Structures are given as structure tokens and as C-alpha cells.
């Protein structure tokens, strides 16, 4: 067993106007909880880091996901909220910053929708984390052929844009790789 517990980083999705999670968010959280249970069965008690700030409606994505995790049986003390990020790149950077501040240098797992996982993984690794993927939700968030392809094609643009931005941030020392201490910026 590792000295540090693995951390499952759950990437946010929309919160509905009534404060309920979108289907994509619910499926991501359920997949993360299922994977966390599998880790527990292997003797590892993971921490969960839902990430996502306030979108168009009241509550932060992270707080809504934390509520879902608690309803799925995850103890509150194993949940670390990251409530500032407004997109995937900001989530990767903010989670890396939070984990460094906690002295965490162990494994992290990205939990998201299948179409989104590659970008999450690449950005977390570029942020200096030992990142892996959590098995994605078993069902797509949308059954519409057009919607599913929209999200996949969106990733074709978002992946090179976000990796280019992360590379620029690292090259300009706005995020030193493996940075430690109070001066570490992510």
C-alpha cells in the first residue's frame, strides 16, 4: 500500500438552474465512486477532489459533486473541494496547486466523460502530477448522435489549445514543474 492515498479528481460539468447535477456530472461522480470502491477493495482508501467553480447557477460544481459523493457513501473527510476552476485547464492547475500545498506526490486519477479524459490526463501530467485515468461512465451523457459528436469534435480543438496554453505557462515560469512551497504557482 502506498504511503499517500490516491486522489480521484472529478472534473466538473454543468449544474442545472434548480441546483441539481446535469446527467454528465452525475455519471462522472458515479464512475468516480465506483472506481473508488474498487480501490478500497484493493486496500487503498482514495481521497476525492471534485473540481469546478460556480457556473451560471448558484452552487459550485465541486460542492454539488461533493453532495453526490456523500450520498453515494463517501465520507466527507475524504473529499477535498476545489471550487475556483472555470474550465479544464484551470481545474488541472488548481488541483495540482492544492495537492502540492498538501504535500501530496502520489497517484491521481482523472474522472470524467470518455470524450474528455485524454485532455484531463494530459493536463494533469503537464501540471506535474502522476496522473492516470479512472474508467469513464458506462453510458454517454447524451444519447443524441449529434450531441455526442459535438463533444468529441470540441475536444479535437480543446486538446491542442489547452496543452499549448499549459506549455506556455510552464515555459514562462507561471507554473514551475513539480513546484513546492508557498511560491509555487499553478
Regions found by a protein language model. Give the residues of each.
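Active-site cores that bind ATP or allylic diphosphates and position pyrophosphate for catalysis
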Residues: 178-186
Amino acid at each position: 500500500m502506498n504511503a499517500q492515498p490516491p486522489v480521484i479528481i472529478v472534473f466538473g460539468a454543468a449544474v442545472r438552474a434548480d441546483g441539481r447535477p446535469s446527467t454528465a456530472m452525475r455519471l462522472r461522480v458515479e464512475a468516480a465512486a465506483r472506481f473508488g470502491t474498487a480501490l478500497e477493495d484493493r486496500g487503498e482508501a482514495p481521497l476525492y477532489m471534485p473540481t469546478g467553480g460556480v457556473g451560471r447557477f448558484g452552487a459550485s460544481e465541486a460542492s454539488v459533486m461533493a453532495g453526490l459523493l456523500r450520498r453515494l457513501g463517501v465520507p466527507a473527510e475524504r473529499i477535498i473541494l476545489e471550487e475556483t476552476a472555470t474550465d479544464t485547464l484551470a481545474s488541472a492547475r488548481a488541483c495540482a496547486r492544492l495537492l502540492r500545498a498538501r504535500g501530496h506526490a502520489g497517484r491521481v486519477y482523472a474522472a470524467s466523460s470518455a470524450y474528455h479524459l485524454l485532455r484531463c490526463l494530459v493536463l494533469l501530467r503537464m501540471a506535474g502530477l502522476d496522473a492516470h485515468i479512472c474508467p469513464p461512465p458506462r453510458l454517454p451523457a447524451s444519447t443524441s448522435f449529434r450531441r455526442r459528436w459535438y463533444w468529441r469534435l470540441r475536444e479535437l480543438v480543446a486538446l491542442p489549445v489547452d496543452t499549448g496554453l499549459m506549455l506556455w505557462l510552464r515555459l514562462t515560469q507561471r507554473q514551475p514543474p513539480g513546484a513546492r512551497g508557498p511560491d509555487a504557482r499553478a
